Amino acid sequence: MKSQSLPVNILALLDSIINEAVSKISEFTTKPTAFSRHRVIDVSKLIMLIINMQSESIQKELFKNISLSGCSIAASAFVQAKAKLKPDIFRYIFDQLNMNLASLKLYNDEYRLFAIDGSDFNQVWNPKSENIVCFEDSNRKPYCQVHLNALYDLENKIYQDCVIQPKNKMDERKAAVEMLSRLECGKYIVLMDRGYLSFNMIQHCNVNKDCYYVIRSKTGFTAIKEISQLPDEEYDGILDCWVTTSNHFYTQNKDHLNIHLVNIHLVNHVNHQYKKFKSKNSKDNSWDFKQFCHVRFRVCKFRINPDDAPNKEQWEVLVTNLDADKFPLERMKELYNLRWGIEKSFKMLKYDDCGIQFHSKKDEFVKMELYAHLIAYNVIMNMVNQAYAPHPKSKSNSEYQINLSMAFFIVHFSRYWIAEEGL
């Protein structure tokens, strides 16, 4: 197969998934009778329009995509038609697209490699929104914001899963557990920053036989007690802890148990609010396991900056269940650095794919457009991954570095022309 024909496959796949969703459109509409009559623009073209929209006003976006819609459509008619759809249809397309992607790269030829992180998206002020963020200080104005929790494939540069939450109800750990519980891809490694570390998160990963995790830990007094007590030197070892939700057991034993053999940590159980005795090292409000639970994990500590580096941390600590023989300290450091790929992806999603530009202040429309941008991002990055641009003067088969900003612009501008012409 010629490399230039590969992008057509992903576009054809997207179109087939859209057509499949449209075939059962009643499951994704606000009313069962929606789109039952002939309209100026059919629902499949409406969905394509929403996915292909960028940062211009609705009128300009409709004009740019007039060849796609096949007719001139007023902005008001477009909004009315859009209001008949549920965001669920874009979630369905997003999931189906990911399920059907082939030839995915593996880290070390063995693992899918993911990162979990979140990013905020501002929406236009809407006093009726559920996404309003308020302040106790009356001098600060409230605003509307949603938080995108994402599971990102670092090797294939695609968003595998997401959870969209109101900023005022954001729970990144809960979202991470939810996304990992849905993941069925064989063995994988997931990288998370220090805000995700908790005993509940560690244990959820431990009980999943396919899950290998690397979670950055805090290093100061707010870290897990055993980690905060580590000396300032390289360390690579196993820690065993007991986690309990029993206030009685904790208070009776915390002062005299041999801390090197048995470590007791109190967490807030949904049915047991022991805030008075809650360990400062266990600030997770969730515990999804039994009253007494043994938690085991590997701790890796290594230097990242010299002692004289101003205003920089000297040491980094990672919590993991990866084998020390296969992943020694130096390799753990290199592996965790790959997490920055998700930070770069958020920048491209927001600015290259215009993900920060919403065309409505309604909550449902904002969620709909976020899913649409994730779909467009995955399609374009899949095309970039398959593109082959050899350097004409290279003798080592090196390739040109593809300009991703231009790739997003070109695909959005000419997407359906490419699909129709077969270029």
How would you label these PLM feature ranges?
Residues 134:
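Extracytosolic and intramembrane catalytic regions of membrane-associated proteins
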Residues 1-56, 64-65, 69-72, 77-85, ...:
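Single, function-defining residue in the core of a domain
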Residues 89-100, 104:
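Short Lys/Arg-enriched helix C-cap and helix-to-coil transition segments
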Residues 112-114:
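Conserved beta-strand elements of the Class I
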